[in-house]
Swiss-Prot record:
It comes from Homo sapiens. GO terms for cellular component: chromatin; nucleus. PANTHER family: HOMEOBOX EVEN-SKIPPED HOMOLOG PROTEIN 2, SEGMENTATION PROTEIN EVEN-SKIPPED. InterPro entries: Even-skipped_HD, HD, HD_metazoa, Homeobox_CS, Homeodomain-like_sf. This is Homeobox even-skipped homolog protein 2.
Length: 476
């Protein structure tokens, strides 16, 4: 019974959808179709008659029609056996072989493929687009294998139709046609954005105002500069990384003392050497004690005489890191007044110092006296409490450790040792507790003696030749 229903369904589908079957059975009426069904049933089951149509009126009305119908059905379904099971298995095997072998097909093989499409049972596959794709494939000589394998879903069927229109074969061609636009978009080379001078100036100005811009501000800049918002976002990211690299590349004096680095950069920006104001992001009290020691002050004083003639002679060495203090620290009170304005008064000891060399020499003598007193265990000479600024940020352990280095450096300038001892007593009276430089906020200084560093020359320092180092007094 199931075989009969399947044959009826296949025959109805051929009458509705197959163009070849439509041509063959166009001259038959509904009764003729029923007669063909009856002939098919009688040929396979000769002992059983159809309950629907009697055999006598059928033969008297149609004459030779059953034999003709049986011939047509044999040619359609490739009937080679009388058993229905063998017929169905031969249909399935022929359909599978036709899927495996692409190439030119005969009419019978194409009809077998059509019957296999019917067995799939998806009504959406019989859309005009699917039939058009199949006809295009047959006309172009393409194989039906990929389209048959991709006919499980409507999407794959539409993909096969696109593939046949684009010259491909089957679902693979359709997927290539659909993915062609995406792959082409990915392969488009993205060139670098060429900013104009006005755009760069506006972006730099905005970066100096604020390193991180919000999205509404980025949108405003994009509208003002006629640039995409993502381009401005990427520019600010790159600019922040460039600024970070520049800060880290300045090996002096940032690793040793961030507070002094902040001081130098701020005053360089205030005088116009830097294009933007520098702001320290970490407070001074966050750092441990890495302040200027007595050895650094002695080294700074030794290079004070040659600072005017050759301010940036050679690159620094690890021991000569703070020799550059000689030039910008001709006014050491700027550091205290910069960090703690209004906390310090002018001592009388520093009132008569007017030049850069004499100021550095007196400061070095005071630092040497304070370090020697700290090394001997004596209390500091000053009476004021130490503050958290660079000049007052010192300890006895650092001073004791620096005394040996000061003695080693002082051996080069032994000729001026007597004068240094005399200056040490006067300079030590105005020094803070254990400090390298005195907190003199209002002492008169010459403006020409202070020259702040710029960002381009911060990696250089003053190193005096050996014959001029004995001009600055040093004490052991």
């Amino acid at each position: 019974m199931m075989e009969r229903i399947r044959k009826e369904m296949i025959l109805m589908e051929r009458g509705l959808h197959s163009p070849t079957a439509g041509k063959r059975f166009s001259n038959l009426s509904n009764s003729a179709g029923n007669a063909v069904l009856e002939a098919l049933e009688n040929s396979q089951h000769p002992a059983r008659l159809s309950p629907r149509l009697p055999s006598a009126p059928l033969h008297s009305a149609l004459g030779e029609l059953p034999a003709k119908g049986k011939f047509e059905i044999d040619t359609l379904f490739n009937l080679q056996h009388t058993g229905s099971e063998s017929t169905v298995s031969s249909e399935i095997s022929s359909a599978a072989e036709s899927r495996k072998k692409p190439g030119h097909y005969s009419e019978a093989a194409a009809e077998a493929d059509m019957s296999s499409d019917v067995e799939v049972g998806c009504s959406a596959l019989r859309s005009p687009g699917g039939l058009g794709a199949a006809q295009l494939k047959e006309n172009n000589g393409k194989g039906y294998a990929e389209s048959g394998s991709a006919a499980g879903t409507t999407t794959s069927a539409s993909g096969s139709g696109l593939g046949s229109l684009h010259g491909g074969s089957g679902g693979s061609g359709g997927s290539a046609a659909l993915g062609g636009s995406g792959s082409g978009a990915d392969q488009v080379r993205r060139y670098r954005t060429a900013f104009t001078r006005e755009q760069i100036a506006r972006l730099e100005k905005e970066f100096y105002r604020e390193n991180y811009v919000s999205r509404p501000r980025r949108c405003e800049l994009a509208a003002a500069l006629n640039l995409p918002e993502t381009t401005i976002k990427v520019w600010f990211q790159n600019r922040r990384m460039k600024d970070k690299r520049q800060r880290l590349a300045m090996s002096w004096p940032h690793p040793a003392d961030p507070s002094f680095y902040t001081y130098m950069m701020t005053h360089a920006a205030a005088t116009g050497s830097l294009p933007y104001p520098f702001h320290s992001h970490v407070p001074l009290h966050y750092y441990p004690h890495v302040g200027v020691t007595a050895a650094a002050a002695a080294a700074a004083a030794s290079g004070a005489a040659a600072a005017a003639s050759s301010p940036f002679a050679t690159s620094i060495r690890p021991l000569d890191t703070f020799r550059a203090l000689s030039h910008p620290y001709s006014r050491p009170e700027l550091l205290c007044s910069f960090r703690h304005p209004g906390l310090y008064q002018a001592p009388a000891a520093a009132a008569g110092l007017n030049s850069a060399a004499s100021a550095a020499a007196a400061a070095a003598a005071a630092a040497a006296a304070a370090s020697s007193a700290a090394a001997a265990g004596a209390p500091p000479s000053g009476g004021s409490a130490p503050c958290s600024c660079l000049s007052c940020h010192s300890s006895q352990s650092a001073a004791a450790a620096a005394a040996a280095a000061a003695a080693a450096l002082g051996s080069r300038g032994g000729g001026g040792g007597g004068g240094g001892g005399g200056g040490g007593g006067g300079g030590g009276a105005g020094a803070g507790g254990g400090s390298d430089f005195g907190c003199s906020a209002a002492a008169p200084r010459s403006e020409s003696g202070f020259l702040p560093y710029s960002a381009a020359v911060l990696s250089k320092t003053a190193v005096s030749p050996p014959d001029q180092r004995d001009e600055a007094p040093l004490t052991r």
